[in-house]
């Protein structure tokens, strides 16, 4: 036992050696220490900083923290505010829409994807401030889907190259869960959380159906971590974690970046990247602060605005040298944008389930993640517990055609329902893309238009996932089931590739066209997988930072 405690202490010291963020919160864990925020380093626009980073979400915050620790002068911009969890977040669905990117956007295509809620974020921490906290890894097979399955695209990096960065981020968040048997089997820094009625229902049904399910992995502290408290299981992870038990860059990487001299400029909308017409190098960013246009000089620029805003920014950065948009000589910017199919199936039970009393995803199976040669579709899906809160639950019920007294009956029955959600690997297609619309936003910038249409393989996957969720719930004793079709998790739009004709960035997240411009967000992912992408985005950004520190010049 003493040896185990010693090993745990050594692992903790290793985390603190590379990321002190959890110890840089106030002692009650409620927010970043005020002296770090109020006394952060402030650069002038005329200071040529080493790097300007656009976006403070999963990718941008990790890059900022790594480079600040390496001694780089770094400024990160975010279009939204620097959140104060206790002040800005509420345990209320309707009162949490300010966490989303609600600026104008257009959607189209055969199967339009709603924007502005679960797949967007605006503010320091990005969409991770309102994500569910679920952080599985991608599988080794995700990196070779074209070679192995004849669909999607191969990554220019391998799973093995990303593994050490997965491990680092899992320790820094930290992640809690059972030993994971799928993909590359591995364990997690913290043990699993207690299981709720929803999770128990999933485990019981999966066992009867012959399906393996496991608890975790969640980026939620199971016990105190630094100044962060234990989860209190209030069930409002998607509305921002008021106690800061759930990890987000706002508390996991930003504090350490500030402590090492980085600046975070909140409420600053970056409008374009400036490129020197003679040298072809990025020299800074144009941005709006309090409605006033400004320009920050920088030796390098990194974009981390995610899969809608990153392509939009590149396209809005057109110039004489790049008339069709920055880095768009081969018409790759905005293409291959993906979502996951995310149908949710609920089952009614005679016992009370109280599905909201836990992190929304807490039990999962990845048994159906890989291509099954006996099935008529390629790739696969995962299944997790989900726990729609009352307003979302009402939307589920109304989607089945229930209104009036019937709707009221389903709402009063809320505590008797359990709910599962699938993540289906929808495939990258070139015509699923972001372009610029004629409409302009309040800054006078063309807004993004996102066109999306499913392929036959996508539809087959969603149908198969629904059937499996129904089987699990019925095996657990559900008396009735209902399913709502939905989407989750945008990725792609500026994908990494081995060749400039097939993508926007190389294996190290440098753009092919501009040698000192990087992209470090979910837009660089060539495929989607059936896993929540946050951990992979952070690991890719950590790897890009590592390569950049080793070799600042290409």
Predicted regions, residues:
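FAD cofactor-binding and catalytic pocket of flavoenzymes
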Residues: 4, 17, 23-29, 107, ...
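Conserved redox-cofactor binding core of oxidoreductases
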Residues: 5-28, 111, 146-270, 490, ...
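A glycine-rich dinucleotide-binding beta-alpha-beta segment and adjacent secondary-structure elements
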Residues: 19, 23-24, 48, 215-219, ...
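A conserved FAD-binding loop/helix module that cradles the flavin
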Residues: 527-546
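Redox-cofactor-proximal catalytic regions of oxidoreductases
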Residues: 95-182, 371, 430
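Glycine-rich loop(s) and the adjacent beta-strand/alpha-helix scaffold that form part
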Residues: 66-69, 73, 80-90, 243, ...
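Extreme N-terminal leader/targeting segments of oxidoreductases
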Residues: 1-51, 69-70, 550-554
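N-terminal Rossmann-like FAD-binding beta1-loop-alpha1 element of flavoenzymes
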Residues: 49-76
